[in-house]
Amino acid sequence: AVKRYWRYLVARYGAYPVVWCMCGEGIMPYYLSETREADAAQQKSGWTEVMAYVRSIDPYANLISIHPNLKGRQQVEDPSLMDFEMLQAAHRDIGSVARSIEQVTEAVGAEPVMPVIEAEVNFEGILGRSWQNVQRLNFYHAVMRGTAGHNYGANGIWQMSTVEEPYGRSPHGRSWGEIPWQEAAQLPGSRQVGLGGQFIRRFPWWELEPRPDWIRCEPDWTWDWPADVVIYGPVCVGIPRQLRIVYMPMVWTPGTIVAIEPDVSYTAYWFDPCTGKDIDIGPVEVSDAGEWTPPLPGECHDWLLVLTSTETAS
């Protein structure tokens, strides 16, 4: 029955520029199942067969993936059947930021190499948390570590909950939250993640390299626990001699840009991920040691620092 359904979908929509997602929550058993391990194994085998079938019958070779309960590669027996990997880091607020960082790092470096998308993490407002600050952390930590895209979600939208007909309780007996979709669509994280997408597309993002060796930042009082070094530590990417981008999840102390090429002149600016505004800094004045510490922006929260070579900028 599932193959027949997919055969219909391919025949009906295959000529359009579509992407095939085999299913949602690939190998996650039903909430109340008493045979969870056996169910997951059967689902993994079944979706592998269906994915191979769709690939064999689609004459347009549309991209194929699967929405996972954790990692896309774990949902099928042969990950090479997928064109890109979806991830899900769950909805544990700050805890899922750390999980997403771990998942993205592993997936981007895995074989076979394929594009990676953080497909579901921390729907805004779910369980009364995961608000806009967490949305920004999830987005920038993912794209700065090599993902090819990012999905934003909001509680209330995924259920299409309304005032007249709230979604209510899931089969496990609990409600994820009852904000109606009309309100959820206006949550600030949506706009701020959208601003992040506009920001990343300013640059040839597919050419960016991870460069942790270009930034030095010491922990300060805003880092409460040892694990905060992962969540609140800076992430740097760039293109040698052309571009440096640093995401600083908490700018109390701005950190120092290091290993600046002595024969390259840079100009710099701050990007505010809350408002989308640029704050010009001007020419980068490099020390004899090849280092530069930027001036603080006006308000302490997360910021992005951009250094562009004057030759590239012109």
Language-model segment annotations:
Residues A1-V116:
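Active-site neighborhood of glycoside hydrolase catalytic domains
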Residues E37, A41, R129, E183:
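Charge-dense, low-complexity intrinsically disordered segments
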Residues P59-A61, P79-S170:
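Catalytic-core region of carbohydrate-active enzymes that cleave or remodel glycosidic bonds
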Residues F123-I126, Q135-G282, T293-S314:
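Aromatic- and carboxylate-lined catalytic core of secreted/periplasmic carbohydrate-active enzymes
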Residues V286-E291:
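Short, solvent-exposed loop/turn segments in extracellular or other extracytoplasmic domains
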